[in-house]
């Protein structure tokens, strides 16, 4: 039994706010923050938003801003969608109340990286969908703020499908499956095939250096490939090629991955020497694409 003094975890409360003016932003943000300030067993709310919206809140709240955290969204969302998952998990572990209790108002950078290309946008929609599963055990209350003037109608419509408080919400696994149904471009004919049953980190590092990666980046890329290969098991083959300034490795394991959360769940504490697998690859690569096939899978890592 959970007592009032000892709140239990869950469920994750994942909401969406769409606004098209400063007034509409404040009309949804201020009640949410008041709710968070009044919630028992919680630290003060945190707002991750565009600098202009943070200024609106400062002006509206005045001295009432108090201990509310105000974070420019370009500082929070400084990397990939997978990085944002790690950022959120780390913040909750360090700062949330019992069971993950905290109110977070979160505005992704749709005018920047998140909205810069259809591929990037797809990864952020995946992030929004999988958040419903990844954070399900926690009692966190998240309000995802969408400025329709910046995000645009297509992104807002896609995001509505990922938030349980909308009438068009869909199963996160269905959305992930839709995104993974988009075929990847075929590897180029001159892709380099790596010898052996598993790619050697040294060979990947040397190849990446020849392609122009700095030694430190080549080391990170080689480690990501090795970690992913170790997690995926026996490989049919591994290919390397350059895509503009980026280095790409495609791993072809002989078995399917069959896990839409692969690489998105932070690994548990492990003994020294044990790897972090696809989690590490997703954290350091620009993209990690997984496509299951009848006789195995294609797992493509793009660095840079």
Describe each PLM feature range.
Residues 182-191, 204, 209:
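Short, flexible active-site loops
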Residues 73-81, 189-202:
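STAS-typified acidic loop motif
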Residues 132-135, 225, 232, 257:
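Amphipathic alpha-helical interaction surfaces in cytosolic regulatory modules
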Residues 26-30, 128, 197-201, 222, ...:
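Short, well-ordered alpha-helical scaffold segments within catalytic/effector domains
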Residues 230-304:
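Conserved beta-strand-loop-beta-strand hairpin that lines the nucleotide-binding pocket
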Residues 200-233, 270:
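Conserved short strand/loop->alpha-helix "switch" segment adjacent to the catalytic nucleotide/phosphoryl-transfer site
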Residues 54, 58, 197, 201-205:
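An amphipathic alpha-helix signature
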Residues 1-185:
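Positively charged, polar, low-complexity stretches
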């Amino acid at each position: 039994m959970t007592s009032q003094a000892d709140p239990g975890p869950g469920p994750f409360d994942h909401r969406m706010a769409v606004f098209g003016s400063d007034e509409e932003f404040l009309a949804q943000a201020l009640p949410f923050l008041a709710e968070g300030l009044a919630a028992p067993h919680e630290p003060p709310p945190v707002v991750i938003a565009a600098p202009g919206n943070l200024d609106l809140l400062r002006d509206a709240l005045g001295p009432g801003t108090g201990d509310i955290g105000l974070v420019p969204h370009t500082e929070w969302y400084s990397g990939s969608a997978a990085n944002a998952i790690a950022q959120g998990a780390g913040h909750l572990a360090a700062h949330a109340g019992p069971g993950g209790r905290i109110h977070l108002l979160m505005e992704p950078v749709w005018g920047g990286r998140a909205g810069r290309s259809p591929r990037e946008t797809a990864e952020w929609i995946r992030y929004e969908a999988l958040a419903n599963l990844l954070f399900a055990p926690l009692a966190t209350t998240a309000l995802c703020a969408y400025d329709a003037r910046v995000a645009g109608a297509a992104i807002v419509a896609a995001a509505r499908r990922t938030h349980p408080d909308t009438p068009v919400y869909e199963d996160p696994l269905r959305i992930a499956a839709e995104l993974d149904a988009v075929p990847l471009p075929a590897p180029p004919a001159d892709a380099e095939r790596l010898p052996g049953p598993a790619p050697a980190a040294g060979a990947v590092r040397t190849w990446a250096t020849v392609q122009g990666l700095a030694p430190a980046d080549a080391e990170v890329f080689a480690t990501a490939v090795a970690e992913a290969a170790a997690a995926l098991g026996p490989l049919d083959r591994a290919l390397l090629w350059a895509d503009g300034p980026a280095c790409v490795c495609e791993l072809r394991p002989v078995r399917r991955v069959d896990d839409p959360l692969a690489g998105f769940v932070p690994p548990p504490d492990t003994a020294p020497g044990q790897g972090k697998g696809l989690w590490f690859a997703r954290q350091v690569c620009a993209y990690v694409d997984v496509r299951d096939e009848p006789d195995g899978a294609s797992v493509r890592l793009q660095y840079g």
